[in-house]
Structure formats: C-alpha cells, structure tokens
Amino acid sequence: MAQTIYVLNGPNLNLLGTREPEIYGRATLADVEKLCAETAAGFGLVAVCRQSNHEGQLIDWIHQARSEKVAGLVINAGGYTHTSIALHDALVGVQIPTVEVHVSNVFAREDFRHHSFIAKAAFASLCGFGIDGYRLAITGLAAKLGASATA
C-alpha cells in the first residue's frame, strides 16, 4: 500500500490564479493539486490535498495526519506562517516530516513576511519557485522518506 502525504494549503490559497497574479502567478489551486498528485505518484506516494481559510481546520488536519499515520506533510500556511504559534505547536507535536512551501519569495516582500513560525517545525522550507515549489517540496519529502522515483 502506498504511503500517504498531506499537502495543506492555508488562507487565500483558494484564490490562486486570480489573487495578485503578478506575485502568485496564474496557476490555480486545482493546478497545484494536480501537480502534487502527479509528483507524489512518481515516487509511489499518494498526495491528499486540502485547503482551508481557518487555522483550527488546518490544526485538525495536522492532528489527523498523526492518527492516520501519514508519512509526511507539505504545508503552505499562507498568512498564518507569520502569526501562528498554534500551527507550529501542532507540527512539532505530531513529529511528522514536514516541508514548508510558499509560491512567492517571502523575503523579497514586506518585512512582516520575513518571519516564519512554520519553518522552525519543518525540516526544509522553499519559497519563490511559483507552484513548482510544491514539486520540489514533494521531491525533497520523498527523499527524506526514502521513496524512490518510479519508472
């Protein structure tokens, strides 16, 4: 049976493709989810993609990942990246390998975006690669899990 990973997207990521396309590009959340599913499958993994604008829902999914023995997490916490100690604590608490990803280069933007509570709970962080960052995140997560690319 294939290992499962969760790809969690936070607030406003449902607006990808229409929200500030000069920063986030024109790809939609559906495009991200398709990319994640295809990339994960290439390593024999199954990606379960979820998005919520609510911090508590994201925390519930992180907790669920532990109870369902999910192998790894990719998270784009959106604006909660810079504010949510609760998300940090949830990630630390479940002890599941996690990669943080952001579509834009948060360090080339406003100062308040330069701090991440998520990064301290993740083994890797990626930003500025557009939606390709998700492919890179899953590739790195697969390597951490010992999953090899399938033919």
UniProtKB/Swiss-Prot annotation:
One of its GO terms (biological process) is quinate catabolic process. Keywords: Amino-acid biosynthesis, Aromatic amino acid biosynthesis, Lyase. The record marks 19 as: Transition state stabilizer. Its EC number is 4.2.1.10. It comes from the Bacteria. Pathway: Metabolic intermediate biosynthesis; chorismate biosynthesis; chorismate from D-erythrose 4-phosphate and phosphoenolpyruvate: step 3/7. InterPro entries: DHquinase_II, DHquinase_II_CS, DHquinase_II_sf. One of its GO terms (molecular function) is 3-dehydroquinate dehydratase activity. PROSITE patterns: DEHYDROQUINASE_II. It catalyses: 3-dehydroquinate = 3-dehydroshikimate + H2O. Homododecamer. Catalyzes a trans-dehydration via an enolate intermediate. PANTHER family: CATABOLIC 3-DEHYDROQUINASE. This is 3-dehydroquinate dehydratase. It comes from Rhodopseudomonas palustris (strain TIE-1). The lineage of its organism: Bacteria, Pseudomonadati, Pseudomonadota, Alphaproteobacteria, Hyphomicrobiales.
